[in-house]
Amino acid sequence: QSELGLIESINTVKQIDSVNIFLGAAAIPGEEFVLTELGPEYVMVDEYSSSNGGIRISRFDYLRQDDAKNFILSKSNYMQAFGISAKTNLDLSSMKSPYYEVVIRVNASDESPLYFSVSCGENCQGTLALPLSPSNAWQTISIPVRCLEREGLDKSQINIRSLFLSQGSVNFDLHSIIIKEENESFSDISC
C-alpha cells in the first residue's frame, strides 16, 4: 500500500492546475526584487524605496480582505522593474495550456509601455507589453504562456516568475499573479 501511495503522490505532483506567484506579496518560495540602473535589490519590507529612489512600493488592503501593493516607477533612461524570482526553477511543462492571470490597476502613467516578462536564464525570456486600461479600474489580464514561449521562454525552467518593466513614469497596483490552466481559448494578448 505504501508503493501505491507514492505513485498517487507522484501523479498528483504532475497534475498542476494553478500556481500562485503573487497574492499581495510574493508566494513562497518567491522573493521580491527591484531592478534599477544600479542593479537588483531584494525587497524585504512592505514600505520600500529603491536605493536610487526610482521605485517606491507600499502595501494596502484590496477590497478590505486581501493585500495588494502599489508601485511607483519614476521616468528613467534605463528599464526599471519589479519582479519575483526563486532559487528553484518552476516547471510548467505538465500544464497543457498555462496562462498568467494578472489583476492590476494603473493609477497614473505617462503612457509609456509597461512590459510583463518571465525568464528562464540569460538570453531566455518572454516579454510582452501589457494591454492596460487607462480607466483607473482593476482589470484582469490573461497572458498565455505560449505567447511568452514565442518570445523565447522555456516554460520548463522558469527562474524569474514575473517581472514588470518600464522606462516611463507609471503608478500601478498589483493584487495577484496566478498561473492557471487555460480552459477556454480566450486571452487579452494575441500572439
Q: How does the language model describe each region?
A:
Residues K75-E151, G168-D173, I178:
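Extracellular ligand-binding interfaces
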Residues E3-R64, N183-C191:
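Extracellular carbohydrate-recognition regions
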Residues I10, V19, L38, I143, ...:
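Extracellular beta-strand elements of beta-rich domains used
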Residues I55-I84:
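Short carbohydrate-recognition loop motifs
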Residues I55, D66, M95-Y99, I158:
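Short, surface-exposed loop/turn motifs at beta-strand boundaries within globular domains
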Residues R150-I160:
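Noncatalytic modules at the cell exterior or secretory-pathway interfaces
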